[in-house]
Design a protein with these regions (language model features):
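N-terminal accessory segments that position/regulate proteins before the catalytic core
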Residues: 1-175, 181-183
Length: 183
């Protein structure tokens, strides 16, 4: 599928008219299908990289939410300074971290989700993170760990291409991608 076709399909889905042609009540959940796992299965014997937990974070600081929101801005020019593994661990925990498990199909996380479903899977294109090789990774929130997925050539260019040609996506220390396991 070329970029123009993909853009048009995405645009259609985001328009209000999509409800006229898509029956949103025919979901897997409404049709009685079992829920997906809390985390996509990890291949047996796969190597994992443990991340430092909250008790080890010293470089994250004590900025109040109000102050953080007041300072927030978009930046498209990135420092060449690599992230520390601690900084990456904090960002992953803040965006999808598990605080507890309710039952085998629900978790309590640092972010809200209707019915504790949390369908998101977090993938990373790592360019400059201390202690990690440049490459693709998947975050394992139940373990607070990374699953290495490979080290493709031209990662910066392919990341920008995946972001519909936005070159800045391949220039930061790390780029987050989210996919969903809908139910």
């Amino acid at each position: 599928m070329d970029d123009t076709t993909a853009r048009e399909e995405l645009r259609f889905f985001l328009k209000d008219t999509v409800r006229r042609s898509v029956d949103f009540f025919r979901t897997a959940q409404n049709l009685g299908a079992p829920p997906p796992p809390v985390q996509k299965p990890v291949p047996g014997g796969a190597a994992r990289i443990s991340l430092p937990g909250p008790e080890k974070w010293t470089a994250v600081g004590d900025l109040s939410l109000r102050e953080a929101m007041g300072r927030r801005r978009s930046v498209r020019q990135f420092s060449n300074r690599p992230f520390t593994l601690e900084e990456l661990a904090f960002l992953l925990w803040a965006t999808q971290g598990v605080r507890g498990e309710s039952d085998p199909v629900r978790t309590y996380r640092t972010v809200p989700s209707a019915g504790c479903r949390h369908p998101f899977e977090t993938y990373l294109a790592v360019f400059r993170v201390e202690g990690l090789e440049k490459g693709l990774y998947r975050y394992l929130p139940l373990e607070h760990a990374l699953l290495p997925l490979g080290h493709p050539d031209r990662l910066e260019e392919e990341t920008a291409r995946a972001a519909l040609g936005q070159k800045f996506a391949g220039k930061g220390a790390v780029t987050f991608f989210w996919t969903a396991l809908p139910w």
